[in-house]
Curated annotation (Swiss-Prot):
The lineage of its organism: Bacteria, Pseudomonadati, Pseudomonadota, Gammaproteobacteria, Vibrionales. It is found in: Cytoplasm. It comes from Vibrio anguillarum. Transmembrane segments: none annotated. This is Protein RecA. Keywords: ATP-binding, Cytoplasm, DNA damage, DNA recombination, DNA repair, DNA-binding, Nucleotide-binding, SOS response. HAMAP family: RecA. GO terms for molecular function: ATP binding; ATP hydrolysis activity; ATP-dependent DNA damage sensor activity; damaged DNA binding; single-stranded DNA binding. ATP binds at G65, P66, E67, S68, S69, G70, K71, T72.
Length: 348
């Protein structure tokens, strides 16, 4: 660039910073805030599938799946993990179905968790926006998008048609929320439900509620499904669960995590550690015996898990080794939302 252009650019940058504040424009290489901070999901397998060690701060995340697949459990596990590292969390319970006893069992500090049960979708999204703008909240969970009912629909009659009303409400909310969440480095997780499209002969008939806006604005989209039951004798004690990373703007997408959700306990962390440890040669398996660092830790997977549960220092050391081995920061992609890619009103 010649000298005159450099002077003109410097003057323009100075004028922009004077008018809009320092940091309003910068060179990409100078932006230290591009390093994305993440919070663990509570599942090592999912953290590895996400590629960054967890879900990103300052971004919108969508978690969707069929009923009883583990969507709320996943978000409560993340809240518990966030609280353990000193983060402040809020739960906007539009479904009016949050169970504090279950949340406590998963490790959530319910005395510190902010909870709102709004009457309308607009109220829920305004509360979310106000919390984000405060700069004091680190994680907001909205459960669920399908329960964000527009005020006009609540005040209307049962048979009234409200075509596209919820989609327009969400589209407007996304435009407001995205910048506020980024500025305050606050993560917002939307739990969503699945619906079936009518008349689809080929391809996947499933879709999520609330229009297209959330799909565009979300940096990460997770599809969570129950794949089987875990039984002890004849009694079901948990679910085999598969979580697919359908969209990922911070690392490579389309990876998946297979994990277990135990009733009343959440993710089977010790089971994940044993399975991943064996797969990556950190835990030795000879017959039915499992060994770690040359010491036998149990006969059978259940006993190996019990050893790790009773020895948290050994479990933490194994977790750290696996994260160092499987999470490569060089693979991270940091992709900011591009306004021109966002859906316009007619695309809802």
């Amino acid at each position: 660039m010649d000298e005159n252009k450099q002077k003109a650019l410097a003057a323009a940058l100075g004028q922009i910073e004077k008018q809009f504040g320092k940091g309003s424009i910068m060179r990409l290489g100078d932006n230290r805030t591009m390093d994305v901070e993440t919070i663990s999901t509570g599942s090592l397998s999912l953290d590895i599938a996400l590629g960054a060690g967890g879900l990103p701060m300052g971004r919108i995340v969508e978690v969707y799946g069929p009923e009883s697949s583990g969507k709320t459990t996943l978000t409560l596990e993340l809240i518990a993990a966030a609280q353990r590292v000193g983060k402040t969390c809020a739960f906007i319970d539009a479904e009016h179905a949050l169970d504090p006893i279950y949340a406590k069992k998963l490790g959530v500090n319910i005395d510190e968790l902010l909870v709102s049960q709004p009457d309308t979708g607009e109220q829920a999204l305004e509360i979310c926006d106000a919390l984000a703008r405060s700069g004091a909240i680190d994680v907001i969970v909205i459960d669920s998008v399908a329960a964000l009912t527009p005020k006009a629909e609540i005040e209307g009659e049962m048979g009234d048609s409200h075509m596209g009303l919820q989609a327009r409400m969400l589209s407007q909310a996304m435009r407001k929320l995205t910048g506020n969440l980024k500025q305050s480095n606050c993560m917002c997780i939307f739990i969503n439900q699945i619906r079936m499209k009518i008349g689809v002969m080929f391809g996947n008939p499933e879709t999520t509620t609330g229009g297209n806006a959330l799909k565009f604005y979300a940096s990460v989209r997770l599809d969570i499904r129950r794949t089987g039951s875990i039984k002890e004798g004849d009694e079901a004690v948990g679910n085999e669960t598969r979580i697919k990373v359908v969209k990922n703007k911070i690392a490579a997408p389309f990876k998946q995590a297979d994990t277990q959700i135990l009733y009343g306990q959440g993710f089977n962390r010790e089971g994940e550690l044993v399975d991943l440890g064996v797969k990556h040669k950190l835990v030795e398996k000879a017959g039915a015996w499992y060994s770690y660092n040359g010491d036998k830790i149990g006969q059978g997977k259940a006993n190996a898990c019990k050893f790790l549960r009773e020895n948290p220092a050994a479990a933490m050391a194994l977790d750290t080794k696996l994260r160092e081995m499987l999470l490569n920061p060089a693979e991270l992609i940091v992709e900011e939302p591009i306004l021109s890619e966002m859906p316009q009103e007619e695309e809802l």
